[in-house]
């Protein structure tokens, strides 16, 4: 056996020695997620992000994050089958300011509506709002039995389906084209568009369960902080607070260089 030093022992301990465990949450911060002013519940929850280190800025990691929230949580409501997507567009202090990014129906709601002995009619259309957002809206509706109908099935003819689909596209285009994004979202919350379609198609074939089932955001205009602040109900107040009222400007006081106020004996 050769006599010599054991190299492994001189290198300082075992090869598989335990490393110091660092808690990953110690390098992260919590930020509040704020919904736009269209919704009743503004505080959605909190999100986690790694603190600013060198060139990696925390706010850059938050911008573009998409949160999917049930409408019941946003409106403090019982009806919970609509989900809204909100995207973080700016970070102010510890608050993530979000904007509308899309809408969807839950899978269980969609499955519960699809049944036998009826016709399902779907339509989709790409529309641009007045403030430059390009949206793709998907609509769904189902035929129902006429009053005093004895027959089990309620199938619509192909020509009637085409007429209903055309009417769906017309109403969706009209409702979005003439409004900005804020007004469109205000119409999506109670789904007034679906009710309008149901009423308009009554003369062609009676419908039920008519919903705008999905809204996709295809294109957005260039980001403007002022417009986002308006959506959050802070645009007008900040600019008004910054400007002093007329007559409140005050008079300039002339003081010598190195002036210090006298020390008061009592406060």
From Swiss-Prot:
Output the PANTHER family linked to this UniProt entry: 40S RIBOSOMAL PROTEIN S3A
Tell me the GO molecular function terms: structural constituent of ribosome
Q: Could you tell me the keywords of this UniProt record?
A: Cytoplasm, Nucleus, Ribonucleoprotein, Ribosomal protein
Q: What is this protein called?
A: Small ribosomal subunit protein eS1
State which gene encodes it: rps3a
Residue intervals passing through the bilayer: none
Gene Ontology terms: biological process: chordate embryonic development; ribosomal small subunit biogenesis; translation
So what family is this one in? Belongs to the eukaryotic ribosomal protein eS1 family.
Locate the compositionally biased regions of type Basic and acidic residues: 245-258
| Record's subunit section | Component of the small ribosomal subunit. Mature ribosomes consist of a small (40S) and a large (60S) subunit. The 40S subunit contains about 33 different proteins and 1 molecule of RNA (18S). The 60S subunit contains about 49 different proteins and 3 molecules of RNA (28S, 5.8S and 5S). Part of the small subunit (SSU) processome, composed of more than 70 proteins and the RNA chaperone small nucleolar RNA (snoRNA) U3.
Per its database record, what is this protein's job?
Component of the small ribosomal subunit. The ribosome is a large ribonucleoprotein complex responsible for the synthesis of proteins in the cell. Part of the small subunit (SSU) processome, first precursor of the small eukaryotic ribosomal subunit. During the assembly of the SSU processome in the nucleolus, many ribosome biogenesis factors, an RNA chaperone and ribosomal proteins associate with the nascent pre-rRNA and work in concert to generate RNA folding, modifications, rearrangements and cleavage as well as targeted degradation of pre-ribosomal RNA by the RNA exosome.
Query: Region (Disordered) spans which residues?
Result: 234-267
Record's subcellular location: Cytoplasm; Nucleus; Nucleus, Nucleolus
GO-annotated cellular components: cytosol; cytosolic small ribosomal subunit; nucleolus; small-subunit processome
Stored Pfam families: Ribosomal_S3Ae (PF01015)
